[in-house]
Regions:
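Catalytic "initiation/cleavage/transfer" segments centered on a nucleophilic residue
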Residues: 182-209
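Signature for HUH/AEP ssDNA processing cores
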Residues: 2-12, 19, 23, 29-155, ...
Length: 209
């Protein structure tokens, strides 16, 4: 009888070990399937691409600017889009307009400070000869930056923030970077606060084909 009880206890122990191994294997299989699905996600729908673009570059959705070029081509610039010429009845930015920008049909710019006086990025318009000095300063701070040439052939350096910050902090952070790099540059945002009457500077959106 004692031997039978010991044998039964041993079987129960083995059963528990086997069940634990089964659970462990099931979890490993589930993790591998999830990892495989994530790795297979190499293509995105049109709306997903636009959402990614917006998450990076669009500082505010309620106001945006569009490039205007005179008929003779001598004058051009970005101006806020409004319903009339009153100047304050701004038209919100839509996915349709962003798609048109990405297709090269229109040329848009975003304002760098949102309606809550927050910023999601800082950017610099620098001379080509200063890019190495700026990059050295960014490297020393552990900051990753992205470079592009805008439609005016100016070098733009984008630094994306992990989360939106008060524009005052973002502006002073940008000034700190320039001081550390010992360079001068046009800064986005170019002020600490924005109001409806004074929106702050806008920056040309990239990836315009």
């Amino acid at each position: 009888m004692i031997n039978l009880k010991k044998k039964l206890e041993a079987l129960y122990t083995q059963k528990e070990q086997i069940e634990q191994e089964i659970k462990s294997l099931e979890q490993q299989i589930e993790d591998e399937l999830l990892k495989s699905q994530q790795e297979q996600k190499t293509t995105f729908s049109k709306d997903e691409k636009i959402d990614i673009f917006k998450s990076l570059f669009i500082a505010r959705n309620d106001i945006y600017a569009k490039k205007w070029v005179s008929q003779d081509g001598n004058k051009q610039g970005f101006y806020p889009v409004t319903r009339t010429f009153r100047g304050e009845d701004f038209i919100p930015l839509t996915n349709k307009e962003i798609e048109a920008h990405l297709r090269g049909l229109v040329h848009l710019a975003t304002y760098c400070i949102d309606s809550h006086n927050n910023s999601k990025f800082v950017a610099f318009e620098i001379l080509d000869e200063d890019k190495f000095k700026l990059q050295i300063a960014l490297n020393s701070l552990g900051i990753r930056a992205y470079y592009e040439l805008n439609s005016y052939n100016s070098l733009i350096v984008w630094v994306f923030l992990e989360a939106s910050l008060p524009s005052k902090i973002a502006y002073n952070f940008a000034q700190f970077i320039l001081k550390k790099a010992n360079v001068t540059a046009k800064v986005y945002p170019n002020k600490e606060f924005a109001t409806k009457a004074s929106l702050g500077n806008n920056i040309e959106l990239p990836l315009h084909l």
